Amino acid sequence: MLKIAETEFGSRLFTGTGKFASGKLMQEAIAASGSELVTLAMKRVDFKTGSDDILAPLLSRGVRLLPNTSGARNAKEAIFAAELAREMLGTEWLKLEIHPDPKYLMPDPMETFAAAKELVSQGFKVLPYVHADPVLCRRLEEIGCAAVMPLGSPIGSNQGLVSREFLKIIIEQASIPVVVDAGIGAPSHACEAMELGADAVLVNTAIASSADPVRMARAFALAVQIGREAYLAGLGSKSLHAHETSPLTGFLNTGLSTTGLVDSGMAEKLL
């Protein structure tokens, strides 16, 4: 079981709610994914009613909501969005996102760290979306973040684990959950992240924008399970050289000698 902030999750696949063609399709895809933690952009919530057209169905499914601060350009805006989320949705869980650049949506490390520090002090369970920066992730852990969410590649790019080598370092040194987020465009990318030792992945665009989101959600669920099993089993090490899986000549020598067809000396000469 995956544990984040003392809460256990049976599924290591987290999903988003954006880009689906309809609310019904979104609900069906989330159900097919088996996800128990679903992120929701605060900018989509109607603060007059405290809801949007998808909030009630999500709550009825029993999933935990992870409101995010997507659209915030600095720490001040992110903190304001977090406080609204706590008041309107009744949750202290938060995916912290601060990306002032609308073209590449790269997370701002300085503003993210400042906001995370303040929000943790207010009792929030902060899951910050960040660059795959091992130093930053370590600092975020030190100030009390519940998990870190380093990117695989830019949001919605479907490029996969471009930051692979840095993710390995983050995973190796972290003592809090590492959730690979952004850029995961295929089930094979999710499987690879889990094989590296990530605790979970968050996927939205690859599911929502596929021709069959429900089937794609199932595919991602299977990929995450397979990747986790492979990691737990222990992957073989890589090598530049070939390594035989069975003796190359010894069995022939033994076989020729024991059958009596030739003596051992002749067997050596034949081989």
UniProtKB/Swiss-Prot annotation:
What EC identifiers does the entry list? 2.8.1.10
The main location class comes to: cytoplasm
* Active site annotation, chain numbering: K95
* Entries under SUPFAM superfamilies matching the protein: ThiG-like
Which pathway does UniProt place it in? Cofactor biosynthesis; thiamine diphosphate biosynthesis
Subcellular location per the Swiss-Prot or TrEMBL entry: Cytoplasm
* Enzyme class per UniProt: transferase
Q: Name one GO cellular component term.
A: cytoplasm
Q: Which residues bind 1-deoxy-D-xylulose 5-phosphate?
A: G156, A182, G183, N204, T205
Q: Which GO terms describe its biological process?
A: thiamine diphosphate biosynthetic process
Q: Which reaction does it catalyse?
A: [ThiS sulfur-carrier protein]-C-terminal-Gly-aminoethanethioate + 2-iminoacetate + 1-deoxy-D-xylulose 5-phosphate = [ThiS sulfur-carrier protein]-C-terminal Gly-Gly + 2-[(2R,5Z)-2-carboxy-4-methylthiazol-5(2H)-ylidene]ethyl phosphate + 2 H2O + H(+)
Tell me which Pfam families the record gives: ThiG
The reply on keyword Transferase is: yes
This protein's source sits in the domain of life called Bacteria
Q: How does it assemble?
A: Homotetramer. Forms heterodimers with either ThiH or ThiS.
Q: Which family does it belong to?
A: Belongs to the ThiG family.
Stated role: Catalyzes the rearrangement of 1-deoxy-D-xylulose 5-phosphate (DXP) to produce the thiazole phosphate moiety of thiamine. Sulfur is provided by the thiocarboxylate moiety of the carrier protein ThiS. In vitro, sulfur can be provided by H(2)S.
> What name is this protein filed under?
Thiazole synthase
What is the species of this protein?
A: Shewanella amazonensis (strain ATCC BAA-1098 / SB2B)
Q: Which gene encodes it?
A: thiG
